[in-house]
Amino acid sequence: MAKGKDARVTVILECTRCVRNGVNKQSIGISRYITQKNRHNTPSRLELRKFCPRCYKHTIHGEIKK
């Protein structure tokens, strides 16, 4: 049987380089990925290297608040 709370939560990863450069969100947009993480194994914010189609390279994508 399942335990009380679900450990897996859905998180959104956003390109930190696009945000830092101040890209206009309406016209160009910011690269975002949706993934899941286990709250018990990784309680801190998640950071992964993913491909950013706006920057045309692999950059660090950090977890943002919903």
From Swiss-Prot:
GO cellular component, one term: ribosome
Pfam family, one: Ribosomal_L33
Main location: plastid
Signal peptide span: none
Origin species: Cucumis sativus (Cucumber)
NCBIfam families recorded: PRK00504.1, PRK00595.1, rpmG_bact
The protein's name in its UniProt record: Large ribosomal subunit protein bL33c
The keyword Ubl conjugation is annotated on this UniProt entry: no
Family designation: Belongs to the bacterial ribosomal protein bL33 family.
PROSITE patterns named in the record: RIBOSOMAL_L33
Highest taxon of source: Eukaryota
